[in-house]
Amino acid sequence: MSPKGDVAVVVNQGGNAGDIDTINVIDLKGKAPRIVRTLDVGQIVEDLAFSNDGNYVAVTAQDGSARAPSHPFYNDNGLVVVFSVNGTNLTKVAEARVGKWNQGVVWSRDGKTLLAQNMAENALSILSFDGKTLRVTGEIKVKGGPAGLRTAER
């Protein structure tokens, strides 16, 4: 849910023969919540996080990186996509390739840095964001496959 509480974005993930590669935008301002948009992101959308100011939402997609290399939809890397948020309108701003089988994503308090989990590499990708460009600037190795990530408010 956005920090303002007026819109929610959810990933669509489920068991079926194909992939559900989308996110839904939900308007929370009316009498009852309702889906107002469905957007394609990439294969197997995993997680999302709003920036602290609510102006952006970052979404992770495995994008085939957790598949066997022989699979026709295999990709070497997962994906982080950033959308700008204007009410219930989301516009894709930037994307960056990260590690394999990526999962969670979090924003820094100032909205300039993101961390994305890469389960297969036992690592977190460090990404910088300037409002237009998203790029990987480093990596933090961890002892196990990172599968849950949040920030602590201070």
Placement of each model-derived feature along the sequence:
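Predominantly soluble domains enriched in secretory-pathway, periplasmic, or organellar proteins
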Residues: M1-R154
